[in-house]
Amino acid sequence: SLNCPFYACAGNHDYGTAKYDFQEGKLQLQLDYAKQNPNSRWKFPSKWYTVELPNAENPLVKIIVLDGSFWEGALTPQEKIEQRRFFKAELAKGTKAPWTWMVNHYPLFSETVDRGDNKQLIKEWGPQLQEHDISLAFAGHDHTLQHLQVEGYKPSFIVSGAGGARLYDCRVTERGFVNNQEFGFNHMHETP
């Protein structure tokens, strides 16, 4: 059973943009629900946030959740600046946790044929991922399962967007493992 908390991050299905023709205000509904129901398993305190698990006093992992939707115009210019400051401040703070993860909906690096690497996200977050000790960078969006190691970057990049829609065509490269033949998801278990 998946009787555990679910920490959400915003992506294209959470914004009501004309490109995707989804309900306007859908993201705010999710944020409001999480705020009004703090004891539920749905955890979504803001568009970007940090959580240390299992607790802040003795964490095993620090998770920095970001909103990569800025590249599609979903964030205001001021929000983009605020998020950049937040990310840099969280990295500067450090943590007692042996693991630090970055989570965002869109992959920075991807072996999908139609999409590939996201140059805007790489420009925005790439320097921090090269300089700081981030263990894993998680993303979804691309309908594949990927585990990539990119030269010059410290974290492993995990793409897990194979939740049920049509799987994307991928190329095979030296950067890592790609599976576009079956659906799946990630369930992580960290130990000291």
Ranges and model annotations:
Residues 1-99, 115-120, 124-136, 144-190:
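Extended active-site neighborhood of metal-dependent phosphoesterases/phosphodiesterases
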Residues 103-109, 137-145:
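Histidine-centered catalytic micro-motifs
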Residues 110-114:
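Gram-negative outer-membrane beta-barrel proteins
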